Structure formats: C-alpha cells, structure tokens
Amino acid sequence: MSQISRKQQTQKRHRRLRRHITGTSDRPRLAVFRSNNHIYAQVIDDAAQSTLCSASTVDKELRTGLKAPAGSCDASVAVGELVAKRAMAKGIQQVVFDRGGNLYHGRIKALADAAREAGLQF
C-alpha cells in the first residue's frame, strides 16, 4: 500500500470542503492559501466569480511594517487584520471561512482569530 503525501491529504480535504462552502454577495468566502514562506487571504464572491478584496504577506503595505518573517504566526495575524480592514471598508460584515484544506491550527488559526478580532463575523 502506498502512503498519501501531506500535500495530497490537503488537496483531498480542500475538495471535500469546497463541495459545501460557497460565497455569495451577502456572505462572501474568505479563502486562505498557505505556502511555506507566505500566506494569502481573499474575500471572494463565488456567484459573480470575483475577488472583492485580498491581503497577503507579499503586499507592499504589509511588508514595510512587518518585523516578523513572512511565514510566521505574527505575519498571519497582520494579514488577518488587513483583510478584515479592507473587507469592512467595502461594507462586508459576514464571511464564510475557507481554510483551503489546511488544518485549523497555527498560521490558519492565527489569521482567522485576527480577522474576527478586527470585526469580521464567521
């Protein structure tokens, strides 16, 4: 029997989750992508197939003020606060959280908690 790699497990979880999670114009989807070095968050309206706002550790606005490495929990907190601020500026109060197949732990949890603290409801 062959072992399933960690990446394949994440992809399998993501496909399973996306069957049940969709974003609407009333309640868009907060999608999170985590790489080894960076973290990205987008607020997506799946009905219109458009990205309403986004934030990541590669944003110039965030890179200048960020003292922690881009792959750390502190950077995830900063991205969560920034995406929540940008969503609130567009009038978005509630979102559906899409963890992208990643476990709700570490950097993903830090981003989600920071977005909640900044005012997003999910």
Curated annotation (Swiss-Prot):
An individual GO BP term: translation
InterPro entries named in the record: Ribosomal_uL18_bac-type, Ribosomal_uL18_bac/euk
Pfam families assigned: Ribosomal_L18p
Positions of region (Disordered): 1-25
An example Gene Ontology molecular-function term: 5S rRNA binding
Keyword terms, alphabetized: Ribonucleoprotein, Ribosomal protein, RNA-binding, rRNA-binding
Tree of life domain: Bacteria
Bias-annotated ranges (Basic residues): 9-21
GO-annotated cellular components: cytosolic large ribosomal subunit
Family under the similarity heading: Belongs to the universal ribosomal protein uL18 family.
Assembly and interaction partners: Part of the 50S ribosomal subunit; part of the 5S rRNA/L5/L18/L25 subcomplex. Contacts the 5S and 23S rRNAs.
PANTHER family cross-referenced by the UniProt entry: 39S RIBOSOMAL PROTEIN L18, MITOCHONDRIAL, LARGE RIBOSOMAL SUBUNIT PROTEIN UL18M
Function: This is one of the proteins that bind and probably mediate the attachment of the 5S RNA into the large ribosomal subunit, where it forms part of the central protuberance.
Record's protein name: Large ribosomal subunit protein uL18
Protein species of origin: Synechococcus sp. (strain CC9605)
Origin organism lineage: Bacteria, Bacillati, Cyanobacteriota, Cyanophyceae, Synechococcales
